[in-house]
Amino acid sequence: MILTLTLNPSVDISYPLDQFNLDTVNRVSQTSKTAGGKGLNVTRVLSEFGEDVIASGFLGGALGQYIEEQIETTRIKQAFFKIKGETRNCIAILHEGQQTEILEKGPTIELKESEEFKSHLLKLFKETDVAVMSGSLPKGLNTDYYTDIVRLAKEQGILTILDSSGQSLEEVLISNEKPTVIKPNIDELSQLLNYKVTNDIKELKAAVSQPIFNDIEWIIVSLGSEGAFAKHNQKFYKVNIPNIKVVNPVGSGDSTVAGIASGLIHQQTDEELLKKANAFGMLNAMEQQTGHINTDKFDEIFKQIEVIEV
């Protein structure tokens, strides 16, 4: 089973407007309201592909209940941990080709809740083969909280994928508890190394071979329309992808993570895993809905992706 963790979920609300006017009333004719969070995008895509997946994380208040109800309608298994605080809203105003976001700070997790959640995870880990950790940490959690989860998972023989950035990722990288997979994009890779990394193959090889990445089995770097670059143990790969009509790229990284998790749980070859991961990401970008793929198009896209050992 694949377990996805979304520790700072949200109710995502989008308001499309022809024009956004300040200091006056703006009326919208339609509203989109969904259960949001990077891990939930991963969950939905895995479920659509037919994988055995369960979603967990922190939920609280009326908005937390709304997320639970939304997930129930999709028949996805869930095992969220209830907190005293209120799950947050994230509002996007879509106007004139631009996007203005209003992000609530979200709940503060109490110390007791953070410790009880680890016990909650240990129960879930009994049936877990791959654990996916996605997104930011909510307030109240130590910046090394992901490090604790990776350690607990590794003790149970579970493969781990960490898709985060900033200090929460850095804390894991400087620890002795390394995840199986990380998936930075080129900008996040540059931030981690404190220098600008380009798409040049030699530069990428040198970048992912830095000591900070020691003992991480898979490093998969997204290169946007140029595909991806990957290091698996001592092998390096360049992934070339076909041109597609991009409808909505939001959630493509999460869909790529879903493909990685699927590849790991089925023990697929390096080539198969990388092709599946990139196919999932592309299929998401071809759809309007975030965290959604058209599985009927999977084989067509999969066959067009090229993986070259470099």
Curated annotation (Swiss-Prot):
Signal peptide: none
Pathway in which this enzyme or protein is active: Carbohydrate metabolism; D-tagatose 6-phosphate degradation; D-glyceraldehyde 3-phosphate and glycerone phosphate from D-tagatose 6-phosphate: step 1/2
Any GO BP: D-tagatose 6-phosphate catabolic process
EC category: transferase
Keyword Acyltransferase found: no
Keyword Transferase appears in the UniProt entry: yes
GO MF, one annotated term: ATP binding
Cellular component terms per the entry's GO annotation: cytosol
Superkingdom per UniProt: Bacteria
EC number(s) stated in the UniProt entry for this protein: 2.7.1.144
Pfam families listed in its UniProt record: PfkB
HAMAP family: LacC
Protein family (similarity comment): Belongs to the carbohydrate kinase PfkB family. LacC subfamily.
Protein name: Tagatose-6-phosphate kinase
Organism of derivation: Staphylococcus epidermidis (strain ATCC 12228 / FDA PCI 1200)
Organism ancestry: Bacteria, Bacillati, Bacillota, Bacilli, Bacillales
